[in-house]
Structure formats: C-alpha cells, structure tokens
C-alpha cells in the first residue's frame, strides 16, 4: 500500500482493509488444481470518506494474467469499506495496493 504521510492513525484502518480484502478474495480452484502459477497485480482506487470505492483500475500486472479479474473483483466485493476515521483530514484517500500470488 502506498500512502502519503498524514496526521492520522492509519495503521488500524489499513489492517481492517487488508483483512476485509483477504476475506473476500476468491481464486478459482483451477488455479490450485493446475499447479504452479504466480503473479502480481497492482491496482489503484480512490476511497471516499464514506468508505465507497471509486476509480478502481489495474495499473500493472506481472506474471499470470488470470489474477487480474479476481483482484479487481475482490475490491468490488469489499465495497463499501467502513467510513474513514473522523481524524482523516481529506475528502478521499488515493490508494495503491499490490496483490502478490504464489500458488504451488
């Protein structure tokens, strides 16, 4: 996750986001059944104060392209997140996340 420095305690909120994304990650069983594949997908999106996601896009893919759709769908399934903390100083938070996959 790439963040600017803000005067708010972002660690608990980002840990919440990470848990929520992991809970909603779905990889087709064929990925596991077919053996070794790996990939890395970097996405960007804007998180509004109310927790809604906007402007979700894939910005980089390394490795197997089959991970792109599940990555984007994971964020869609997690939307909305809980609202940003009251101490967050801006109307939105731009985030960059990298999902790293290794299936053996």
Give the residues covered by each predicted segment.
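Intrinsic-disorder/low-complexity signature in envelope-associated proteins
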Residues: 1-20, 30-33
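Conserved "boundary/linchpin" sites in short secondary-structure elements
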Residues: 1-4, 19-25, 46-60, 72-83, ...
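Active-site phosphate-binding and catalytic loops of NTP-dependent enzymes
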Residues: 27-33, 83-84
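A short glycine-leucine-enriched loop at secondary-structure breakpoints
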Residues: 34-36, 88
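Short, small/polar residue-rich loop motifs at catalytic or cofactor-binding pockets
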Residues: 36-42
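A short acidic/small-residue loop/turn micro-motif
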Residues: 60-66
